[in-house]
Amino acid sequence: MLDLKYITENIDEVILKLNTRGGDFSHLRQLIDLQEERKSVIKEVEDLKAKRNEYSKEIGELKRQKQDASHVLLKVESIKSDIPALELKLGEIDEKINKELIVLPNIPADDVPVGKDESANIEIKKWGTIRHFDFEVKDHTQLGEALNILDFERATKITGPRFVVDKGLGARLERALINFMIDTHAYTHGYTEIIPPFIVNDKSMYATGQFPKFKEDAFKLEGFDWYLNPTAEVPTINLFRDEIIDNDALPIQYVAYTTAFRSEAGSAGRDTKGILRQHQFNKVELIKFARPEDSEQAHQDMLANSERILQLLNIPYRVVVLSTGDMGFGMSKTYDIEVWLPGQNMYREIGSISNARDFQARRANIRFKRSKDAKTEYVHTLNGSGLAVGRTMIAVLENYQNQDGSITIPEVLKPYMGVEVIK
């Protein structure tokens, strides 16, 4: 959520920057009028309460002097009836303001490229050497089905499209990737490992910015105010909702493994084949809570941590900065890591690393104090894929395939797999 004071004091700049995300935000000028009306009503309430206190003192004095105070009592009663009406009006104004603020996306950072969609994204780095095959390359679906490690037909029978059954060494490979990612982030990069709930409530979804915009993408549990977790970002950010963090505890960084669930309501017809875009998928997520002055460095560190997974797997990738029109709703700046997939002969997203600054912290009311007597401030929150497990599995299968259809296990995964080849 954006700061109302900042919006009203910098309205032209805010509208200009939000417009780069797509759409017209000129209607935000009405927030200035609403804010002024709010201040006026608050002053009116405060003035009436001050008068009520004065009259109460006057009544006390009159009674001590054994004089008639009925005329002053009438004034107090009049004020008592006026204040609730004004407080009701104030509540209505606050509701109007909150309805505007809750649907506003985050303001893009100054160095984010301006553009309407992914075509304006800017590549800033490439890593690794793309392998040149001397045989016809297969995609992960062909490889997985031929090796009997991915079963799409039975998954569709069990549930429906966009699901898969991992079998045998396929299941072991997915588990190996999860453990390898968590071990690397926990032991090498210093993140604290957590396994949060896979079910979250309505407040948690609003706090991180999933709601209201992406409500159609969520799976709701009928009869409950609960939703299946769309990303570990949601439960992990909400660990500190409505809390004040000790300054000495910052920065806080977690690595969280969850299964994620998404309806993919806006993705009809896209990536329907294979495990690239599914309703249920495993994901290792990185989360940081940082002081405002430290969040940019925290963002760079998180990006490097996520990149390290692919470097250790020795799989080519590139990093792009997302444009204003391609960024997520609650993010101020996002890097995408795109892995090379020989089966598609292109780079595909395998993880996003984002800085939300104080946007989520305001929605979730997550604050910190620099000292005992200091005023509270909002923390900055950051999140990143570390990585999407299914897409990493695709990258391993396609980049490490052999002419006979077998898959060579990357060196770093051999201790987890117990075999050197899937065949």
Curated annotation (Swiss-Prot):
Binding-site residues for ATP, renumbered to this chain: R262, S263, E264, E349, I350, G351, S352
EC number: 6.1.1.11
Pathway: Aminoacyl-tRNA biosynthesis; selenocysteinyl-tRNA(Sec) biosynthesis; L-seryl-tRNA(Sec) from L-serine and tRNA(Sec): step 1/1
Source domain of life: Bacteria
CC annotations in GO: cytoplasm
GO terms, biological process: selenocysteine biosynthetic process; seryl-tRNA aminoacylation
Binding site for L-serine: T231, A232, E233, E285, S385
Cell compartment(s), UniProt: Cytoplasm
Catalytic activity: tRNA(Ser) + L-serine + ATP = L-seryl-tRNA(Ser) + AMP + diphosphate + H(+); tRNA(Sec) + L-serine + ATP = L-seryl-tRNA(Sec) + AMP + diphosphate + H(+)
Known role: Catalyzes the attachment of serine to tRNA(Ser). Is also able to aminoacylate tRNA(Sec) with serine, to form the misacylated tRNA L-seryl-tRNA(Sec), which will be further converted into selenocysteinyl-tRNA(Sec).
Summary of subunit composition and partner proteins: Homodimer. The tRNA molecule binds across the dimer.
Similarity comment: family membership: Belongs to the class-II aminoacyl-tRNA synthetase family. Type-1 seryl-tRNA synthetase subfamily.
Database matches in NCBIfam families: serS
Protein name: Serine--tRNA ligase
Organism name: Acholeplasma laidlawii (strain PG-8A)
Gene that produces this protein: serS
